[in-house]
């Protein structure tokens, strides 16, 4: 009986999450959700929101103005990210071109000078709901962006523990 040579091989190419995600049905649903939220927010701020803001006390009206600006900024970042990812999915942009676009429009991870919750509580419920929805969507997109990002280090190849044990046996027993 001859010596059996066992080798650990993993020659499968690494699956890049970003490339597969932007082509998935999940991304299409996320895209629709994001763009729908942008449209709903624009319709609200141009219609009922404008009317509701006129009924607010002065301090609440100032909070309304600052929170609606934060909301639209957050939604512009979301829409920009979604459009870049869709362009990658449809072959209009390469991953490297998308990375360049990412440096132009950054997803902010923190919002400075956020209004106190007690002030936000005085805002119309419709605006509060849009703010909450946009924050949840923004958090999801930040998470996805970190997963897709090429900034993560490439994992180093690992030696198979089975191969190492087999090698020790081969050395010990020839």
Per-region residue spans from a language model:
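Surface-exposed peri-terminal alpha-helical interaction modules
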Residues: 2-174
């Amino acid at each position: 009986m001859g010596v059996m040579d066992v080798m650990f091989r993993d020659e499968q190419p690494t699956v890049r999450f970003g490339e597969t995600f932007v082509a998935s049905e999940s991304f299409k649903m996320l895209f629709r959700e994001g763009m729908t939220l942008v449209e709903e927010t624009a319709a609200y701020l141009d219609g009922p929101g404008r009317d509701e803001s006129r009924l607010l006390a002065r301090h609440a009206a100032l909070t309304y103005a600052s929170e609606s600006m934060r909301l639209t900024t957050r939604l512009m970042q979301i829409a920009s990210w979604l459009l870049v990812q869709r362009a990658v999915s449809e072959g209009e942009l390469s991953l490297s071109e998308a990375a360049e676009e990412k440096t132009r429009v950054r997803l902010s991870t923190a919002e400075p000078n956020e209004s106190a919750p007690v002030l936000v509580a005085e805002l119309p419920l419709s605006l509060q709901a849009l703010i909450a929805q946009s924050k949840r969507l923004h958090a999801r997109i930040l998470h996805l962006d970190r997963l897709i990002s090429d900034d993560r280090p490439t994992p180093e190849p690992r030696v198979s523990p089975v191969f190492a044990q087999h090698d020790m046996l081969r050395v010990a027993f020839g």
